[in-house]
Amino acid sequence: MLTLKIFVYTVVIFFVSLFIFGFLSSDTGRNPKRKDIE
């Protein structure tokens, strides 16, 4: 059961980080001053 919980937490953290990364990249897309991140 512990392995399942660790797996679920890993998937949740993965999707949350994907969402945050997509939000930040779309934010830099609208902000022309932050082109150096690419």
Curated annotation (Swiss-Prot):
GO cellular component, one term: chloroplast thylakoid membrane
Membrane-topology annotation of the record: Single-pass membrane protein
Compartment(s): Plastid, Chloroplast thylakoid membrane
Family annotation (InterPro entries): PSII_PsbI, PSII_PsbI_sf
Stretch forming the signal peptide: none
Gene Ontology process terms (BP): photosynthesis
Residues that span the membrane, as ranges: 6-26
Keyword annotations: Chloroplast, Membrane, Photosynthesis, Photosystem II, Plastid, Reaction center, Thylakoid, Transmembrane, Transmembrane helix
Main location: plastid
Family: Belongs to the PsbI family.
Subunit details: PSII is composed of 1 copy each of membrane proteins PsbA, PsbB, PsbC, PsbD, PsbE, PsbF, PsbH, PsbI, PsbJ, PsbK, PsbL, PsbM, PsbT, PsbX, PsbY, PsbZ, Psb30/Ycf12, at least 3 peripheral proteins of the oxygen-evolving complex and a large number of cofactors. It forms dimeric complexes.
Function description: One of the components of the core complex of photosystem II (PSII), required for its stability and/or assembly. PSII is a light-driven water:plastoquinone oxidoreductase that uses light energy to abstract electrons from H(2)O, generating O(2) and a proton gradient subsequently used for ATP formation. It consists of a core antenna complex that captures photons, and an electron transfer chain that converts photonic excitation into a charge separation.
Record-given protein name: Photosystem II reaction center protein I
Organism: Mesostigma viride
Species classification: Eukaryota, Viridiplantae, Streptophyta, Mesostigmatophyceae, Mesostigmatales
Gene (name only): psbI
